Each structure stands twice: as C-alpha cells, then as structure tokens.
Amino acid sequence: MAEFQGIIVIHKEKGFTSHDVVAKLRGILHMKKIGHTGTLDPDATGVLPVALGKGTKLVDLLTDKEKTYEAVLHLGITTDTQDMSGAVLKEREVSVTEEEVKEVLRSFVGEQMQVPPMYSALKVDGKKLYELAREGKTVERKARPVCFYEIEPLEIHLPLVKIRVTCSKGTYIRTL
C-alpha cells in the first residue's frame, strides 16, 4: 500500500485529544509518520491540520503561523481548569456593560506575557502539566511572550461573550 504524503485538515470533535486523532489516523492509514500541528484542548472542536509522511517536514512552517480561534467567555465564574470543564471555585455577579467588555478585550491586543495554565499539554520534566494538575500538584510556570493580533467580540449576551481571537502560537485562550 502506498503511503500518503502531505497535510490533511481534520475537524476535531469534542472529547478527543489531538493525540487521539493522530493515533486513530495511524490505525486507519497504517502509517507511523503522522503528526499534528498544535494541541487543541480535548473540549475544543475545530480545525486540526495533520501531517502525513513527508508532510511532517512542513509542520514547523505551519506551527509558526498565527492562529484564529472562536471561544465563549463566561464572565463571573472561576474554575480550577480555567475553562468550563473544571470545578467551579468562585462565582460572582457580573455588573459590566457591553462597552466595558469591548474595552477590556481591546486592552489585550498586542504583546503580552502569559503564564501557561496548569491544565495544558505543556511538558515540565517530561510530564504534561495537566497530568501533574490531576495529581493535585502545581509547578511554577514561566510567563512566555504571546501576541494577540485581534480580539473581536462576535456576540455579547452577558455573562456570555463570544469572541474571535487571532494570536501567535503558544497562546492559551482560556487565560483571557
């Protein structure tokens, strides 16, 4: 059987890790040389470019590019995972206007220093941060430079705010 070469675009469903998608493709295509171009959270849905065969040589070119995400912010809730999959730690009433929300979103545009969340696939000493977090451990993470090129509010129905974010690689939307 001929090996596939190139890049394919997969629509990742909620509940699967990026690694799950690659593992499934390895089984379907009977190939070992397959890789994705960046980790999407298990709860995220959307485009996951996957490199096959010689296409894996292009991964660095793709991962250095800006990325665009759509997300829904739920104002007034703090969770242990910084997303809605986690346990609620704090809840408070939201008393802001749409204009104040837009102003805060605009304030994030540009260069920022961002601390990666504990619930992320970033590795420390060979172990993924989310594995350590599930064990109840917290480790110090260094702030990293990221850039928000654009943050556009798509819908505002307080306390929910749907946004489109165009940002640099390595940016965690959940930390907004």
Regions found by a protein language model. Give the residues of each.
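Catalytic/RNA-binding core of pseudouridine synthases
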Residues: M1-T175
